A protein has these predicted regions:
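ABC family nucleotide-binding domain
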Residues: 3-224
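C-terminal boundary and immediately downstream tail of ABC-type ATPase nucleotide-binding domains
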Residues: 214-215, 221, 225-244
Length: 244
């Protein structure tokens, strides 16, 4: 049986009086590609950010590789090394070259030698199709290139799972495809991925599972076929009618 990598139990998150997550229960298996869809304000990004504790849950548990990471006794930094994150706005350091951005965490947090870190960074640049950009600065790159660099940076720590928070929504339409192509290659390689996105074609083609969220709850969780073609849930139908 495939190992459960992330287990979420009765997760609640409130900002003041606004309850954004209302008792989420979810399991993510090793090697799965899980895509989370839903209308704006449904809690998708908050759920993703709660998985690696960028947002602290108000109540409930996040269990990662068998360890309750919401328990303050456990080492959050060690866990974060195993959970990569790719943000909507890239979050690259503008005063560092591409290769410095990619090697910063492996050198600083894993204690890797510069030589080892740079060798892997160059391999990752090949993987994301930007082998000649090692010495470039982020501002000289297009949005699509910056997001591919951000993905390479996420992979540099050799994480067990990569979380993507709307990785294409800040991009011009012509750049979306190049980022999705890199993500598709990662999915084929067996990388565990949890992706919040509005790209329904990608969800349909690449996901093992699609989760539809609305109003802070998981409305439906199933295969792409179950969600996109066989849903019996009215809220899912209404959402898909608007976006497809």
């Amino acid at each position: 049986m495939t190992e459960t990598l992330i287990k979420i139990e009765n997760l609640h998150k409130s900002f003041g009086k606004n309850e954004v997550l209302k008792g989420i229960n979810l399991e993510i298996k090793r090697g799965e590609v899980v895509v989370i869809i839903g209308p704006s304000g449904s809690g998708k990004s908050t759920l993703l950010r709660s998985m690696n504790l960028l947002e602290k849950a108000t109540k409930g548990k996040v269990i990662f590789e068998g360890v309750d990471i919401t328990d303050k006794k456990n080492d959050l930094f060690a866990m974060r090394e195993k959970m990569g994150m790719v943000f909507q706005q890239f979050n690259l350091f503008p005063n560092m070259t591409v290769i410095e951005n990619i090697t910063l965490s492996p050198i600083k947090t894993k204690g890797e030698s510069r030589e080892v870190a740079e060798k892997r960074a160059q391999e990752l640049l090949e993987k994301v199709g930007l082998p000649d950009k090692a010495d470039a600065y982020p501002q000289s790159l297009s949005g699509g290139q910056q997001q591919r660099i951000a993905t390479a940076r996420g992979l540099a720590m050799e994480p067990d799972v990569l979380l993507f928070d709307e990785p294409t929504s800040a991009l011009d339409p012509e750049m979306v495809g190049e980022v999705l192509a890199v993500m598709q290659d990662l999915a084929k390689s067996g990388m565990t991925m949890v992706i919040v996105t509005h790209e329904m074609g990608f969800a349909r083609e690449v996901a093992d599972r699609v989760i539809f969220m609305a109003d802070g709850v998981v409305v439906e969780d199933g295969t792409p076929e179950q969600i996109f073609e066989q849903t019996q849930e009215q809220r899912t139908k209404d959402f898909l009618r608007k976006v497809l």
